[in-house]
Amino acid sequence: MISVTTLKDRKVALFGLGGSGFATARALVTGGAEVTAWDDNPDSVAKAAAEGIRTEDLRNIDWSQQALFVLSPGVPLTHPKPHWTVDLARAAGVDIVGDVELFVRERRAHAPDCPFIAITGTNGKSTTTALIAHILKSAGYDTQLGGNIGTAVLTLDPPKAERYYVVECSSYQIDLAPTLNPSAGILLNLTPDHLDRHGTMQHYADIKERLVAGSDVAIVGVDDSHSALIADRVERAGVKVVRISRRNVVADGIYAEGTKLIQAAGGAMLPFADLDGIQTLRGSHNAQNAAAAVAACLAVGVSADAIRAGLASFPGLKHRMQPVGQRGRVVFVNDSKATNADAAAPALSSYDRIYWIAGGLPKAGGITTLAPYFPRIAKAYLIGEAAAEFAATLGEAVPYEISGTLERAVAHAAADAERDESAASAVMLSPACASFDQYKNFEVRGEAFVGHVAALDGITMLIGPATGEK
């Protein structure tokens, strides 16, 4: 745990006692701050109180005595309207921050030179974050992985020289981290997202820009207009910018030509790595993720050979285009995290012959946007509440069956793929749906898929065992 010592003996108000909020409260208390915490959920308040954290409705505290207000990233700061605690803090002139800002302050106070890589973007954050951490760990570096990827940043080991931090940052976390200053900051891309919380696309882009604007080295994907403008603007402000692209040549940076990553510097274009054959980095979207990881690792001093070795051994992100088993020429892919059509598109674009397991609790829009990938689908196996709707969309374009359950879909898809005498194929769970009609969450759905695959005869598992339980 990182004890927040920079607020020792000072009064701090905190709202939000979920996962990261609870961890933040503990880190503040351990560091000696006088914390008063609250949450709208009585169970969360009771849990904090049982751990010795002082709890009180923040409507009743003296805000003029608070040195700082810590807000959990899931609580609205600006849109659709500020949370009531935000209004109280602003009325009293109290600064509002989040857990990433507290981490930044502790690093600055105790180990300002320890390498810190921060990653943001609309898509690809988690894969890029996990890939960077894997490369660093494989190269023997003391590596701490956290942030929006699922591990609260203040639960990591304390900052010290030669300890490397890899932190995924959501727009909400950046908005609450005014002095964010990573050694290498990555902005992968920008498309409209979370506008219910940020109001406009411009405001959303402005928040994302803060991460790279404060970086020693800014690594920016320039395949969308918003990010390209940010790269130019940050560069004019004096920040060193490394551009990355999966579509176009860049003058100084890393770009992709098919599966090859090219390093451009000083007018030279040098091959850096080839992703061909790396199952966990298939697709042009992963070429961009890999380019960002390469640029970041080079920026913090990792050797080219160590980076190449890390790329080749990357196990992938769980439930995201994750190869889990192999039988002959058939690979079994767990893409359970694809809970809408846009999220399913990268996996469908990455394989040429697919036995597609799809369905669950449908999202607005269905799968109509996936029509360009229908020629890649040998057959679809439809499950859950969305089965009938998806069947209507597929029509005569794609052969399909309504399997109903995931277990039946896996068995039928595996049998059909094995009989397929054409090129290598993939049995893929990429549901384009939420899981809640049949499973607690997409993780449980993914583990169930892995379990059903493991139960097939003649399977070579590419990952550890799974329970397959719902």
Swiss-Prot record:
Taking the first listed entry, what is the main subcellular location of this protein, grouped into a coarse class? cytoplasm
- Tell me the pathway: Cell wall biogenesis; peptidoglycan biosynthesis
Q: Name the source's superkingdom.
A: Bacteria
Per UniProt, the keywords (alphabetical) are: ATP-binding, Cell cycle, Cell division, Cell shape, Cell wall biogenesis/degradation, Cytoplasm, Ligase, Nucleotide-binding, Peptidoglycan synthesis
The Gene Ontology terms for molecular function here are: ATP binding; tetrahydrofolylpolyglutamate synthase activity; UDP-N-acetylmuramoylalanine-D-glutamate ligase activity
Q: Which reaction does it catalyse?
A: UDP-N-acetyl-alpha-D-muramoyl-L-alanine + D-glutamate + ATP = UDP-N-acetyl-alpha-D-muramoyl-L-alanyl-D-glutamate + ADP + phosphate + H(+)
| GO CC terms in record | cytoplasm
Instruction: Please tell me where ATP binds in this chain.
Output: 121-127
- EC number(s)? 6.3.2.9
Principal EC category: ligase
Q: Which InterPro entries match?
A: Folylpolyglutamate_synth_CS, Mur-like_cat_sf, Mur_ligase_C_dom_sf, Mur_ligase_cen, MurD
Membership in a protein family:
Belongs to the MurCDEF family.
Q: What does it do?
A: Cell wall formation. Catalyzes the addition of glutamate to the nucleotide precursor UDP-N-acetylmuramoyl-L-alanine (UMA).
Instruction: Please give the name of this protein.
Output: UDP-N-acetylmuramoylalanine--D-glutamate ligase
Q: Which organism is it from?
A: Rhizobium johnstonii (strain DSM 114642 / LMG 32736 / 3841)
